[in-house]
C-alpha cells in the first residue's frame, strides 16, 4: 500500500514537472538573449532581431517594432534596414553594474500591430579597462622600536572596478629586510593586505623605512597601481589599543533620517598619558560609504549623514581604526545592513496606447500596453494593478510586469463618448503605497443609428388659397451619431395624388425639413394629403427612417353664396312671383334657395331683405330664405313689387350675393294687365330723354357715314371716267386690270353691312346698337315673314296687332276664356289655389311661369309702337322669348299659394286649336328684348 502511494506521488510530481518545464519553455520562447562587450563603439552589432522574431527586416518598421526602455538613456536601437540590434551609445559596465559580477540589461521589444512584448536580455561583458588604485597618495605607519617580530600592521586596500579576472588579484611589496606582506581574507571574499614585522627594529640605526605597495589585476595585459608606504620607528609604547568587539554588526532601515547614530565603537589602551588616548578613524573606506556615514574621532560614534537607499546599496562593510598617542593602533570591522522599507510607490509606464477606438469594436480590443515597477523588494515590491469595476475595460497580465488594457464589452458612443480610465498600481507593503495614471480614450462614431423622428406621425394644416412657396410645416429627425453620420437630409416619397405626382404639390427642404407648398390649394378640390417624409443620414452606408405626415387643407371663405333659385335668365329678364291681394300675413310667396361651396360656418347662410319697394310688406326667413307676406295686402299697394334679397355666409370676412325678385300683386289677371300699361307709361317718361339723346347721336353718326360714302363714290366715278378717256385716246393700249374699288352695288352691300339699328325699350336706360345687321328698311316685309312671327297669347278682349302684314291679321278673334299656348310656350304651375267663380287659375307650374313671363313682357313692350299689346285691357300678346328662363329641378315648389283674384281667364293644358283665326304677330318686335327691372 505504501509503495502504491509512493508511485502515485512520483507520478504526480512527474506530471507537475512536465507542466512546469512546458511553461518555462513557453516563457523562455519569448526571451531573447544577447551579449556585448563594454566600451564598444556606437552602432556595434549586438544581435539579429528580425531573425529571432521570425520577420523580414523590411517588416520591422511596417509592424512598428521598437524598444521599450524604462531608463532615461537609450543604450540600444533597432536598425530597420538590417534588422539588427545595435548599440546606441557608450556602454560602461562599471557605471551600470558597479561591483556586480554579472551585468545584465533587460529591455522589452514591442510589436505595435499585435501589441506583443518580447523580453531582450543583453549581458555586458567586462573588459580590463580599469587599473587597481589606492585612495591614499602615501601611507604612514608608526612602529615602536620594541615591536616584536610577527607584529602585523594594516595596509590600505586597492580598488579595481573590473570584475572577474580583470579585477584586483594580488599585492606586491618592494623588497626590504624588515617587513613582509601577507593577505587576510574578509567576509565578502576580498583580501586585505597587512605589513608583517620580520625582525627587530633599531630606531637609532634607521628611524624610517620607505616601502612600495603594488596592486595587480588579472587582465591581459595586467594593470597595476602602487602607493608608497613610510614606516616610522617610534620610541617605546607598551600597549596597543583594543576594541571591545572584533566585528560590529548593525541593521539600519533605509528611511533613517540624517544625523541618527548607528552605533558606537570603543577601544581601550592601558597606557598612560598620551599613549593611552585612542583616536578613531575609517580605514579603506569606499567613497559611497564615506558620503553616507561619519565617525566621531573622539567618541567613536558612527552617524548617518546621507540617505540610505536599499535599492542601491543593501550592505556596507567598513574598517575602523583605533590609534593611541604613541602611534599604536588596532582595527575592527563594522557591518551595516540596510533594511528595506516600503518607501517607493509603484511606477506605471504607458508603453503603447491608442486615443480613439471605433464603437462596436469587438470585446478584447487592446487599448493600451503598460508596465508596472516597484523599486522595493519582497512584499514591498509586489504590485497589483486594477481599474474601476464599472468601466467596460479590464486588465490582463502579459509578460513580466506588463499589462494590457482591453475592452470587456462592446462600446456605444451614444451612451458614453469618451472615457477617462484611471489605472491604479498598489504594492503589498505596510502601509501599501499606490500610484495612478490616466488613459484618455475617445469612442469614434460608427453609423449604427438611423435618424429618429420625435413623433410617430405628424399633422399639418394649411389654409386654402395659400401663396405658392408658403411654408407649411417643419419636421426634425434626430440622429444620435456624430459628424457625417448625424447629418440628416429630408425627402418625400414618390407618391401620386389624383394621378399627379406629389412633387407638384409640395416640396421639402433637404437640409431643414421645412415643407413648402408648390401651388395654391383649393379646399373644394381636395381636403387632405398623405405624405411620407424620409430622413436619411450621410453615413456609409446611409441609414434612414420615415414618418407619415397628414396635410389638411383648411377651408377659407373664398366662395360667395350661389343662388340656385330664382336663377338669373341668360337674356337679362327677371322672373315674376305672384301674390294675391287676398293673401293673409305669412303667405308663402316664394323661396330663395342658395348654396355655398365652402364648409363649416363658411357655408352657413343667412337670408335678409336688403331692399323693398314697399318696406314692411314682405319678410324673408333668416335661415330658410322663404319670402312671406308680413301683413295683409292693401289696395294701395303697387302691382309690381321689387325685392332685393341678400344671402350672406358666416365666414370671416363674410361673403354675400343678392337677387332681385319681382312680385306681382293682383286679385285677377285683367287687373294685372291693366296696371302694367300705366307702369310702362311711367317708365317711358323716365327714359324718354335718354332715348332722344341716343336717336340724335345715331342720326349724326349716320350722316357722317353717308357723306363719306358719297365722297368715296364720287372719287370712284372720277377715276373711272378718266380711265375711259385714256382708253379712247390710246386705242392700241391693252385693257386695264379690274379696279379694286367696288361699284355702286358694292356700295349698297357696304351700306347693308355697316347699317345699324337703335332698339329702345321702355324699361331700358340705354340704347342697344346692334352690329352687324343688314338694313332692310327699304324693303317691304313679306307675307312669309309675317307668318313666321312669334305666337301670340290672346285674351278675352284681344287688341288689334299692329304691323305691316295682311289685313286679315287685324281682325279680332272671338272671345275665349281658354288660354291656349304652344307646347314650347306652356307656362308652369305657380300655385294650386283657385280664384273666384268668374275664371280658372292656372293649375300647373309651367303655366304660372309663363304667365309671369307674359306679365313682365307686357310691361316692357307698353311703350313700343310695334308692341303686340293693345286694344282692350283684357287683351295681351307675348313673344315666345319671354317664357320661363329658369328651371326648378333643385328648388321645391313654394308658389302653390300664388293667387290672383278677379281673373275671368281660364288656363288649360289642352293644346287645342284657337277659336277663330289664329292671330299673326308683327315682325317689328323680333329684335326687341325685355330688360330687367331697375330699382
From Swiss-Prot:
Alphabetical UniProt keywords: Calcium, Cell adhesion, Cell membrane, Glycoprotein, Membrane, Repeat, Signal, Transmembrane, Transmembrane helix
Subcellular location: Cell membrane
Compositional bias per record (Polar residues), positions renumbered to this chain: 807-844
Residues in the Extracellular compartment per record: 30-693
Signal peptide: 1-29
Glycosylated residue positions: 48, 255, 266, 420, 546
Stretches the record annotates as Disordered: 805-844, 905-935
GO BP: cell adhesion; homophilic cell adhesion via plasma membrane adhesion molecules; nervous system development
GO cellular component, one term: plasma membrane
Annotated SUPFAM superfamilies: Cadherin-like
Membrane topology according to the record: Single-pass type I membrane protein
Keyword presence, Transmembrane: yes
Thylakoid keyword on record: no
Pfam families: Cadherin (PF00028), Cadherin_2 (PF08266), Cadherin_C_2 (PF16492), Cadherin_tail (PF15974)
Bias-annotated ranges (Basic residues): 925-935
Residues on Cytoplasmic side: 715-935
Summary of the function given for this chain in its UniProt record: Potential calcium-dependent cell-adhesion protein. May be involved in the establishment and maintenance of specific neuronal connections in the brain.
Protein name: Protocadherin gamma-A11
Species of origin: Homo sapiens (Human)
